UniProtKB/Swiss-Prot annotation:
NCBIfam families per record: uS10_euk_arch
Role this protein plays: Involved in the binding of tRNA to the ribosomes.
Stated name of the protein: Small ribosomal subunit protein uS10
Family assignment from sequence similarity: Belongs to the universal ribosomal protein uS10 family.
Length: 102
């Protein structure tokens, strides 16, 4: 049977966990096997920026960072389960990718 690999990425881990719970509920209702969610390493993007807008004075820096959290879920590619997966309400800051594998 085909497997569907669901990759979730977002800046808020709470949103990712909520979507993972929704996927787990869908798997329980439809009776398909589910493995995951597997937490992948968090990427930290850091940008140093000067505090002073004109460049004069002492060199003081601010460091801005954004953390990207990722989750990985494998689920059997049942037609009913995939249709329900497509109907999940996904927040704007979460990206979801579904890939079918043999």
């Amino acid at each position: 049977m085909q497997q569907a690999r669901v990759r979730l990425a977002g800046t808020a881990p709470e949103d990712l966990d909520d979507i993972c719970d929704d996927v787990r509920e869908i798997a329980d209702k439809t009776g398909v096997t589910l493995s995951g969610p597997v937490p992948l390493p968090t990427k930290t993007l850091e940008i140093p920026a000067r505090k002073s807008p004109d460049g004069e004075g002492t060199a003081t820096w601010e460091h801005w960072e954004m953390r990207v959290h990722k989750r990985l879920i494998d689920i059997d590619a049942d037609e009913r389960a995939l249709r329900q997966l497509m109907r999940i309400q996904v927040p704007n800051d979460v990206s979801i990718e579904i890939v079918l594998e043999d």
